[in-house]
C-alpha cells in the first residue's frame, strides 16, 4: 500500500476547494456575529463520558475512541460539537439569561453516514440557550435561511417537524413507548405495512395508537398538513401544543418555501420541540439540521432551554458553483528595497501579490495574474496585463 493513501472516507482538500471553504467559514461566522452570536472553540478530543453524557447510542457508535496516555481514561474524538457547546454554556459560562454561541471545527465519524458521505466534516453551527419560547426557534431558522442565502444556495426548502407529536402518542400508550426505536425507524421510512406488521406482534398496543402511527407516516406535504394532523391524530395531551407551535412558525415565515413532515422523527429522544431540516436543489440530502433540545444540558448539572442548528461546510461548498480563480498581481523576485516596499504596500491594501521565483514563471495555477508590478521610469508601478 502506498504511503500516499488515506483511510476510507477521508480526503485531502486541495487549494481551490480549501479557499472556497475558508471564504465560506469567514462569511458565515461574520454573519452570526451580526446576530449577536459569540464564537467558542471546544477541544477536538474529550473524555468520552463528557462527549456522550447527553446523547444517545447513535453518537456513541459514530465516535472514535482512544486511551489517554496520561490518565488511562477513554477519550473520544468528537463526532458532533453540540454537546461540547452545551457544556460550555451550562458549566463554564454559567450565565442566567440568554446566551448565543456559534462554533466551527472538524468532527470525525467512525463510519460514514452513507455511501456519499465523508467521515471528516467541518461542522459550523449556532445555538441559543436560555429561552424556551417560539422566538428563539424562529431566530434560529431565520439564521439558517440567511446562512444558505449568504452561501449562494438556490431554492432552499425548509422541512418542519415537532418531536412533541411523537412524544404525545407514546406518552398516551406506554406499550408503544417500549418499542420507540423500532417505531421511529419505520416512521422515518414511511413504512405503513411495516408499522402494521409490528403492531400485530406487540401485545397490548392500542388500536388508536396503531391508527395514529399509520396516519403519522402519511402526514407530509405543505403547511396544510398541520390542519390535517389535527383531524387525523388523537387529541391526547401535548398534541395540540405541538401542532400549535408548528403553525406559529409557519405563520411567521410567509416568504419561506417550506414543508411539514411529521414522520421525520430521527431526533426522537434527543429533541424536545420543533425540529427542522433544510434542503437545496443541488444536494442529495439535507444541508442543515437542527431543532430544540431543552433536556440536554441537564447532564451538565444545569437545565437550560436550547435550540440550534449545524451543517457541514465541506458538503455545502462541494455543491456550490466553483469560485472564480483569485485575481493577483505578478511581481518579480528581487532584493531592491523599492520593490520590497511596493509589494508590502500592495499586500497591506488587500492585494494578492505573487513574486515569481527564478525559473518558475508559469507556476501560478491557483491565481489569475491580470496585473504586474513593473519598473517604469525608475518607479515600481502596477500595470494591467
From Swiss-Prot:
Pathway: Amino-acid biosynthesis; L-histidine biosynthesis; L-histidine from 5-phospho-alpha-D-ribose 1-diphosphate: step 1/9. InterPro entries: aa-tRNA-synth_II/BPL/LPL, HisRS-like_core, HisRS/HisZ, HisZ. GO terms for cellular component: cytoplasm. Transmembrane segments: none annotated. Coiled coil: none annotated. SUPFAM superfamilies: Class II aaRS and biotin synthetases. It comes from the Bacteria. It holds the Pfam family tRNA-synt_His. Heteromultimer composed of HisG and HisZ subunits. This function is generally fulfilled by the C-terminal part of HisG, which is missing in some bacteria such as this one. This is ATP phosphoribosyltransferase regulatory subunit. It comes from Bordetella pertussis (strain Tohama I / ATCC BAA-589 / NCTC 13251).
